[in-house]
Swiss-Prot record:
Family designation: Belongs to the eukaryotic ribosomal protein eL24 family.
Protein name: Large ribosomal subunit protein eL24
Function: Binds to the 23S rRNA.
Keyword entries, A-Z: Metal-binding, Ribonucleoprotein, Ribosomal protein, RNA-binding, rRNA-binding, Zinc, Zinc-finger
PROSITE patterns from the UniProt entry: RIBOSOMAL_L24E (PS01073)
CC terms in the record's Gene Ontology section: ribonucleoprotein complex; ribosome
Organism: Thermoplasma volcanium (strain ATCC 51530 / DSM 4299 / JCM 9571 / NBRC 15438 / GSS1)
HAMAP family assigned to the protein according to its UniProt record, in alphabetical order: Ribosomal_eL24
One Pfam entry name: Ribosomal_L24e
Gene3D superfamilies per UniProt: Ribosomal protein L24e
Length: 66
């Protein structure tokens, strides 16, 4: 089985867990929890600005290096 990563927070999702969401345009999004799904789809939040996501921490590291 292929381990997938969450489309919102960036965590790895073990096979048999998580949520697969298919948009109308055919894009497939994988979520590790309902929290991630609600933040991305329901609340339209961008992962770069949510503090508990991996993308936020990577961006923060880049800012502190410069």
């Amino acid at each position: 089985m292929l381990a997938r990563t969450c489309s919102f927070c960036g965590k790895t999702i073990e096979p048999g867990t998580g949520i697969m969401y298919v948009r109308k345009d055919g894009a497939i999004l994988y979520f590790c929890s309902n929290k991630c799904k609600k933040n991305m789809i329901g609340l339209n939040r961008v992962p770069r600005y949510v503090r508990w996501t991996n993308e936020y921490h990577e961006l923060k590291k880049m800012r502190t290096r410069s």
